[in-house]
Amino acid sequence: MKNNPYIIWLTGLAGSGKTTIGQALYEKLKLKYKNLIYLDGDELREILGHYAYDRQGRIDMALKRAKFAKFLNDQGMMVIVTTISMFNEIYDYNRKQLKNYYEIYIECDMHELIQRDQKGLYTKALNKEIDNVVGVDIEFDKPEADLVINNSCRNNLEEKVELIIKKLAL
């Protein structure tokens, strides 16, 4: 690991597996690193306040997440963040402002996301019952991530976690 700990930013659409992979990564790394914290996007929204779910509201919320991660990282914490925040403005900000930033894109095809639809977001959005769903009526910017993990098949969680650990030399 570099002199400063990483900010590991897992991004992907709702239901792609960010939280599952992020939590598994946290559980594995906390055995080795005491200066580790896990920040879930949904939980941070509860803590930091509800912003609008439109594109600009999502960007504003993502910037708050990034600034909070930076605050913790500047104090020596390794930070794992799981968040949708799939906008070029966020990628650019993070690459410029966050030290030891490592971006992981959890990719999953839309058909599979609709099949999973854990929160009912995609079904409701496609039926025009709700709006402001990233990937349906809010376009997203696919990141040029340091690592892309295809999670269209929800298998091999341990292998995906080990791949991240290997890439970061943790």
Swiss-Prot record:
Gene3D superfamilies: P-loop containing nucleotide triphosphate hydrolases
Disruption of the gene: reported phenotype: Mutant does not express the MeOPN CPS modification.
Pfam families, per database record: APS_kinase (PF01583)
Keyword Kinase: yes
UniProt enzyme class: transferase
Organism lineage: Bacteria, Pseudomonadati, Campylobacterota, Epsilonproteobacteria, Campylobacterales
NCBIfam families found in the cross-reference section: PRK05541.1 (NF004041)
Protein name as annotated: Cytidine diphosphoramidate kinase
GO cellular component, one term: cytoplasm
